[in-house]
Amino acid sequence: MRQMLESSARMSRYIHFAITQKHENVWIAQREGRAKDSNDRTQDSVLKMLAMGGGRDVIDSLKELNIVPAALSYEYDPCDFLKAQEMQLKRDVEGFKKSQADDLMNMQTGIFGYKGHVHFQTSTCINDELEALRGLPKTELFARVSELIDKHIHLGYRLYPGNYVACDLLQGS
């Protein structure tokens, strides 16, 4: 646990250094791994890690990063058949675990597989909205920042016909 905390702090310090001193952009995933249902949500733990490197109050530390949420949506999920296969194996084979080869196949398919139309959209920097959260207790603060980032990402999504079909199927309409 201590080693993981030290590693997170080192990563956070480097991200702050890269942005504030080297004037570089950093793209970081909002969560570890991928959600099987593609409903990715920002993990509070990612924000806690990012806040570690600022060396002061959480809001100031996050504002220093000039966070700009970005949405990436595509028409087809190239990994859909792999996700379905994994879900079926988990259902049918007790104790099933994906192998490292399975993970590599998923990554390769996700990167190079056919996606149809692809849409990328950035929102505006959320610094002003972060300022409005100043004063919240830490226990609530990270959850609210996660919700804020998710809201901006969801507003940037482009929906394709398959999304509407899936919604109809889920709602039984």
Predicted regions and their residues:
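Membrane-interfacial terminal anchoring regions of lipid-handling membrane enzymes
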Residues: R2-V26, E32-S173
